[in-house]
Curated annotation (Swiss-Prot):
The gene is argS. It catalyses: tRNA(Arg) + L-arginine + ATP = L-arginyl-tRNA(Arg) + AMP + diphosphate. This is Arginine--tRNA ligase. PANTHER family: ARGININE--TRNA LIGASE, CYTOPLASMIC, ARGINYL-TRNA SYNTHETASE. Signal peptide: none annotated. It comes from Burkholderia pseudomallei (strain K96243). Its EC number is 6.1.1.19.
């Protein structure tokens, strides 16, 4: 049911309920609160198209039999002239459920709506004028992006698209942790490589990173190469193995550039990159700490500065400043979120790994302790669990490039058909490989709820059959394109014939089911945005592809008779459009040929 139709039916039912309540109570209780009208899709198709339990909600306050109330509500509903175009039949089920069957014309209306709105179908202005800052990926610039970052990128970019579809002005932000201990480890790792050392050699630093990418950084530093991140100034290798600060600066910029390349291959763009180091150079960390001290939210104990996080629900107070004068890692996070608030983002969503769960209470406690108007529960979080990569039935734990983990680039190349063991080779980064790999990785990583662990099966991603979910959905789109092209070629037809087509021939069970599934798309987007659950779009696309295949296998589209032929092509055209729209939400291509 389309949103406008749903709103109309809710209004008609609300009017019906008012009539029944008025007849029962008269004007005796003007303060009586009517229950909200909730419409649901019955789990069993035989029970109708729409179910409503309002009679059950009214039974106790009215002291009436719910089945009798349901009968009265249905009588009042069908007596309204506007209901004739929507409601074909009504029945009372069980203790008092109202089950409604919609008219064929009301179901067929979705085709005209989709064809008229095109890529805008499903979008809403519900949240127009609202701003949201969405922070995701936010990897340390100490190595290539790993598969966990890939899951964040897929979730974050899809959620950004979904929120934008509901009218939000979305600001995508990447926070670079470029000021911690790990950056120092990166510098000494690169320095060791520049000195000719390798992992396992005498003198190799214990905290150093072992991946081959460190050797690449050291080589380019010694060769005097120039590197630049997308938002930064170019940095040239100084060739001095003793200048640790020059090495650090070059290595960080080198890896930021590499991460930019990975994100580009993944199809993810950011509006802003925010550097943790800027929080220190601009004095924001000290300012935040001073404000918390002034607010009485801290105390000194055993030479350390503690934050009273228990005042805000944490299980124990937390150290802010250690005895050596350095800050614990959540302190700059508090300062960073203050900047989000000061920039006018009253809604902020962070997508992070589930290992960050412990920092949520600390960051929120710090923000509350500042007493600057930040609401409780700020920011929102979407936490995702780990990704396990499987190939040939075995877990893949490391890659040649990273040394200790599988990278996003590995996953894109493997899923695109690159030869195992040759990851990172420039010749493999052709557009076809990137597109195939990106589509598979993005769809797979968003095809489960964020809070569930995910097994990424490379072998499944390479399959070209119905077992592969992204292939299944994309093939539905490509098959429709093929049928429509054949229709145009064989009959000299054009798209102009479709908007005004007679849709009455679309009366089969399969056609009705497909049209109802198309009409669900706007609600799917609204739900995905409201619940911060972009996986709902992936679920929906698989269901839509399934309904299409059921229809296509049951009914021949290009029949001799023009009326049913044009109607069926119109249904396919609408289905193709919604498949394209949904895939675009996930950042996945909609191929016309496969």
């Amino acid at each position: 049911m389309l949103p406008a139709q749903k709103h109309t039916l809710e209004t008609l039912l609300e009017n019906s309920v008012k009539q029944v309540v008025q007849a029962s109570k008269g004007d005796a209780d003007a303060a009586f609160v009517l229950p909200a009208i909730a419409l649901e899709r019955p789990k069993v198709a035989a029970h109708g198209d729409v179910a409503c339990n309002v009679a059950l909600q009214l039974a106790k306050p009215l002291g009436a039999n719910p089945r009798q109330l349901a009968e009265q509500i249905v009588a009042a509903l069908t007596a309204q002239p506007e209901a004739a175009g929507l409601v074909d039949a009504a029945e009372i089920a069980g203790p008092g459920f109202i089950n409604l069957r919609l008219t064929p014309a009301s179901k067929q209306a979705v085709i005209g709506a989709v064809l008229a709105q095109g890529r805008a179908f499903g979008a809403s202005e519900r949240d127009h004028g609202k701003r949201v800052l969405l922070e995701f990926v936010s990897a340390n610039p100490t190595g290539p992006l790993h598969v966990g970052h890939g899951r964040q990128a897929a979730l974050g970019d899809a959620l950004a698209n979904v929120l934008a579809s509901q009218g939000y002005a979305v600001h995508r932000e990447f926070y670079y942790n470029d000021a911690g201990v790990q950056i120092g480890n990166l510098a000494i790792s690169t320095q060791a490589r520049a000195r000719g050392l390798k992992p396992g050699d005498a003198g190799w630093p214990e905290a150093a990173y072992n991946g081959e990418y460190i050797a690449d950084i050291a080589r380019d530093y010694l060769n005097g190469e120039t590197v630049a991140a997308s938002d930064g100034e170019p940095v040239t290798g100084k060739r001095d193995v003793e200048d640790l600060e020059a090495i650090r600066k070059f290595a960080v910029t080198y890896l930021r550039r590499e991460q930019d390349m990975d994100l580009k291959a993944f199809g993810v763009k950011f509006d802003q990159y925010y550097l943790e180091s800027s929080l220190y150079t601009e004095g924001r960390v000290e300012k935040t700490v001073d404000a918390l001290i002034a607010a009485g939210m801290t105390y000194e104990q055993e030479g350390a500065l503690w934050l009273r996080t228990t005042d805000e629900g944490d299980d124990k107070d937390r150290v802010m400043r250690k005895t050596d004068g350095t800050y614990t890692y959540f302190v700059p996070d508090v300062a960073y979120h203050v900047t989000k608030w000061e920039r006018g983002f009253t809604k902020v969503i962070n997508i992070q790994g589930s290992d960050h769960h412990g920092t949520i209470a600390r960051v929120r406690a710090g923000l509350q302790g500042l007493h600057i108007g930040i609401p409780k529960g700020y920011p929102d979080y979407v936490l995702h669990k780990m990704v396990t990569v499987m190939r040939d039935g075995q877990e893949v734990k490391i890659s040649k490039r990273a040394g200790s983990y599988v990278t996003v680039r590995d996953l894109i190349e493997w899923s695109g058909g690159a030869t195992p063991g040759s990851e990172g080779s420039p010749e493999l980064l052709d557009e076809a490989t990137i597109t195939r790999g990106r589509d598979a990785v993005r769809f797979f990583l968003i095809s489960r709820k964020a809070d569930t662990e995910f097994v990424f099966d490379i072998d499944l991603a390479l399959k070209q059959n119905d077992e592969n979910p992204v292939y299944y959905v994309q093939y539905a789109h490509a098959r429709i394109c093929s049928v429509i092209n054949e229709w145009k070629s064989r009959y000299g037809a054009t798209d102009a014939l479709l908007p005004g087509a007679d849709l009455s021939p679309l009366d089969s069970k399969q056609a009705m089911a497909l049209m109802q599934k198309l009409a669900e798309y706007p609600d799917v987007l609204a739900h995905a945005a409201g619940e911060l659950a972009p996986h709902a779009v992936a679920f929906y696309l698989r269901e839509l592809a399934s309904e299409f295949h059921s229809f296509y296998n049951a009914e021949r589209v290009l029949v001799d008779e023009q009326a049913p032929r044009t109607a069926r092509v119109a249904l396919l055209a609408a289905t193709r459009q919604v498949l394209e729209n949904g895939l675009a939400m996930l950042g996945v291509s909609a191929p016309s040929k496969m």
